[in-house]
């Protein structure tokens, strides 16, 4: 039986594509393994998925671009992670390794290269993350969402692979209940921010609940179960799975962070959106670059977190609603998307 090892973690964005690809390989008779951190979100997501995947936990350290005494300890953690990954590779003898990035992916990538296993990487952002910059040196091939410099000879630009499906499924009963609390005459605004990125949106909705629900139907994906609420013109929930796409479709506008996975999902369904990227104090600035790219293309509006107020947000919402046809036309004309089926076929071809 053919074997494939996946790696990637630290954030949902470093796991999502893996979760989409793994069922495809399982259906085609592959034995699927995953290398990550048992304390990381990658382990949680795989357990939640119920997929027939063998998880291997390794030591991992954070890769920092700045001086920290913690770097000294983390060098040893990464080194031990490489040794652990090497033993896993030599024991499994997989046909390939697929990496979605994140700090935990570096040891398996290095170990795969050392043990002669082909390495395929996916980069979602406009600028490469530090983990993928290191991993690129050991890669057989890298697939990118955005076009990269021509000097990166191992990169193939494939566009975004999104988890939003074109298939229309029956509306969940819960969605019907939500809609009975909404005013059909008001625009519906969905706030989605990922695990840590949702906090600023949660605070905005909490602070201005009255004003917001007078003018809009509000959906707030909070990541915090203590905020769960369904009331007039307001639905707040910590986490959704089957409801994710129906809520996207229900919304007239989405207010989101600048992670590549989410904004390309919005592009795929031509959904109006305001991007509030994580600032450089909380990230390496990749979300700011992603947001600027989308604004330049005419797909979205952006708003820096430091400038986020009720008034500034409403100005962006009003502008998008007033120019809805222009934004949607540009999104529908985009050539920057690839279906999961097409990407899977491309990956299988490269593996053969």
Swiss-Prot record:
Cellular location(s): Cell membrane
Keyword entries, A-Z: Cell cycle, Cell division, Cell membrane, Cell shape, Cell wall biogenesis/degradation, Glycosyltransferase, Membrane, Peptidoglycan synthesis, Transferase
Major location category of this protein: membrane
Functional pathway: Cell wall biogenesis; peptidoglycan biosynthesis
EC number: 2.4.1.227
Annotated catalysed reactions: Mur2Ac(oyl-L-Ala-gamma-D-Glu-L-Lys-D-Ala-D-Ala)-di-trans,octa-cis-undecaprenyl diphosphate + UDP-N-acetyl-alpha-D-glucosamine = beta-D-GlcNAc-(1->4)-Mur2Ac(oyl-L-Ala-gamma-D-Glu-L-Lys-D-Ala-D-Ala)-di-trans,octa-cis-undecaprenyl diphosphate + UDP + H(+)
Pfam family, one: Glyco_tran_28_C
KW Chaperone (keyword) present: no
One GO term of the biological process aspect: peptidoglycan biosynthetic process
SUPFAM superfamilies: UDP-Glycosyltransferase/glycogen phosphorylase
Binding-site residues for UDP-N-acetyl-alpha-D-glucosamine, renumbered to this chain: 195, 287
Keyword Glycosyltransferase applies: yes
Membrane topology listed for this record: Peripheral membrane protein
A single cellular component GO annotation: plasma membrane
Top-level taxon: Bacteria
Example of a GO MF term: undecaprenyldiphospho-muramoylpentapeptide beta-N-acetylglucosaminyltransferase activity
Gene3D superfamilies in the cross-refs: Glycogen Phosphorylase B
Stated role: Cell wall formation. Catalyzes the transfer of a GlcNAc subunit on undecaprenyl-pyrophosphoryl-MurNAc-pentapeptide (lipid intermediate I) to form undecaprenyl-pyrophosphoryl-MurNAc-(pentapeptide)GlcNAc (lipid intermediate II).
Similarity comment text for this entry: Belongs to the glycosyltransferase 28 family. MurG subfamily.
Protein name: UDP-N-acetylglucosamine--N-acetylmuramyl-(pentapeptide) pyrophosphoryl-undecaprenol N-acetylglucosamine transferase
Gene label: murG
